[in-house]
Amino acid sequence: FNILNHSNIIDFNIKSAKVLDLYSGVGSFGIECISRGANYTVFVEKNKETSTVLEKNLCDLKIDNNKFYITNNEVNWYVQNNKAKKFNIFFLDPPYSDQLYPETLKVVKESKMFLNKNLVIIHRESGSKEDVSSIINILKVKNYGRSKIIFGTFLN
């Protein structure tokens, strides 16, 4: 989150943001956004056991139920069936073995679920080679050990 607060390349304020946390796992990113003032977060996690841990995390942290929604659907299904919803932060953290996430990103872009001021954050393995430059304008790529974080905005 420091890069969001202190970057001269990424100009984005989390306060009042509407966050779509795809492949959310136990919800670390979305929960952090809520703690920093995001309006709400939608967590999309198809694994029921993992989403149960996510629910427990939200409960343990006493996060207001109006600040989040959890769905146990496939990511692409959620996007296809919720096109009317608009978000300005999109976080994608697919399993490292998932090479198909660019298709998910493309579906999000084509669905027009993003507000004009938006930020896309993708967490991948540092050696991954998937190309998303036809879907997002890549602002910055940061490597952290085995991970890389891609920051961008949807292309119009």
Regions flagged by a language model, labelled:
Residues 1-156:
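Class I S-adenosyl-L-methionine-dependent methyltransferase catalytic core
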